[in-house]
Amino acid sequence: MKLRISDLEYILVTPIRAVARILALVFVFVVYIVQLWMLALKQKRLASDLLALTARLVLYAMGVRVVISVRDKSLDESKSRPVIYLYNHQNPLDVFVIQGYLRVPSITTAGLHLGLVFPWFSKSALNAGHVLMDHLNTSSRGSAMYKSSEILRRYGAIIIAPNGSLKTTILQRVSASAWVLARKHNACIIPWTFAYENLKISEEDLYNPFKILVSRIMARPSTINCYIGRSKDLDLPSDPRDREGFSRAVKLYYREQQESD
């Protein structure tokens, strides 16, 4: 049985890649600990910046490259109004993209899981402006909506995954929470699309950050491509009470994005 050149390269490169990623992960935790220290010293801005650096380093250590593509002048339309970004949440690593690259407050359930790997992650995320939520708890979901209003007033922007869960795609479910929030604050709604290359994570590992870290040590390099659309790309209903119309418009947009890939 003959080995292909690509297989031989994989065999030779994998051990080197694994060692490099382990060393990078050690540095990740050093930066994260310094971030906690800054948080304890009330250096909140610096702590937030260090959390963003941690997020970037985590992706680097796992062999994940992030490519941000801004089409035309998509960001210009949000300058005069608050903005609510939507995105198709399909991968547990999205939280690191948002914190490390987009630098936008989000509604996230990451606090339920990342604390297993990053101690006091919830406190770090709250300091960075994120709204923590337990999507299985009705009270928590209601509280998240209230806090989202506060974040939108304070920061002028927030990013929301309308599908709300890694196990439910945006083509299956779209919550109207972003629509309600936008009407309340006269906010502009702009969609992000995340596309993943060589980054499949098994369903049983979606909420297990430790297993994901371990599995990525020897995995082939991957890419997350992030594309921003325009507010006018969403054919949103004129009636602010039309939640179903909002859901249909968002599903249609992401279906078209999926078909164009």
How should these model regions be labeled?
Residues M1-S6, I68, D72, E77, ...:
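Soluble, non-transmembrane catalytic domains of enzymes that act on hydrophobic metabolites at membranes
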Residues N88, T138-G142, L171, R243:
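A conditional alpha-helix N-cap/helix-loop micro-motif detector
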Residues P82-I84, Y155-A161, C188-I190:
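Residue-level preference for the first positions of well-ordered beta-strands
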Residues S148, A157, G164-L166, I170:
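Soluble extracytoplasmic domains of inner/organellar membrane proteins
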Residues W120-S122, T168-P240:
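A cross-family acyltransferase "interaction/gating" segment
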Residues Y32, L36-L41, E77-T138:
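Catalytic core of membrane glycerolipid acyltransferases/transacylases, capturing the structured
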Residues K2-I84, L93-V97:
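Membrane-anchoring hydrophobic helices of lipid-metabolizing enzymes
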